[in-house]
């Protein structure tokens, strides 16, 4: 059972909640314009590195006629995804050795996976399993904007804790996180180099601002709670990865401080006290054909 990523890098709630926001229906038309998929045709689509299944779930909603298979090497992600979405086939597997025959799929898609996998294997396996004329879609996060609410600033205790953790945390190197980063120019170049043609690029802007009047109260609260999940998952990762750097008492105090901050932010929202905190993600979409 492989649970390295969910235990040491990004927790289930962090990935699922943040991706559900990133692929919310408010941004659907931006994505669809770049994907250029025919929703009236019964396509076979493979998502590589699906995590806890948020993107596969959304794709099933956007393209109900498409038969979707989603694969990840983390057992906990796959188990969670299966419990959330029954219209998708979720499997454990390796992006560098896809368990499918040649020419099996019409579309492959991945989200924030390319930077973690050796490029010749990442693109080579997709080229192999795609049918002639099949489409490869690679989504990659680019530099965005993150302005937190003032009440979410770290206290001196939190700052000291995270500084201590940073001195000893080698999980990025140990687990090959972002081992193969590529710039906005290098990513489409790599897709061409490994056999794809008609390569195109585009960008989706995901604006998450809870106090924006256009944002529903439900969505605003979801945005705030997703940030809370991210911080709590980061704390859990410390316990899993370098437990000697966080005593039970320290971790309990950190949880109290984190929850108190987010409870205050929720109270501010409920009272109509606008903070104008925002998170703007820029998602690069690269599309190529076999």
List each language-model region with its residue ranges.
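Conserved alpha-helix/loop element of class I SAM-dependent methyltransferases that forms part
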Residues: 21-41
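N-terminal, positively charged/glycine-rich alpha-helical extensions of SAM-dependent methyltransferases
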Residues: 1-14
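Class I SAM-dependent methyltransferase SAM/SAH-binding core
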Residues: 46, 52-97
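A short acidic, Gly/Pro-enriched loop at the edge of an enzyme's catalytic core
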Residues: 96-107
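Conserved Class I S-adenosyl-L-methionine
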Residues: 180-181, 200-289
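Conserved catalytic/acceptor-binding region of the Class I
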Residues: 138-229
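A short glycine-rich, Lys/Arg-flanked "PGG" loop and its adjoining helix->strand segment in the class I
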Residues: 121-135
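A short SAM/SAH-binding and catalytic strip from SAM-dependent methyltransferases
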Residues: 107-120
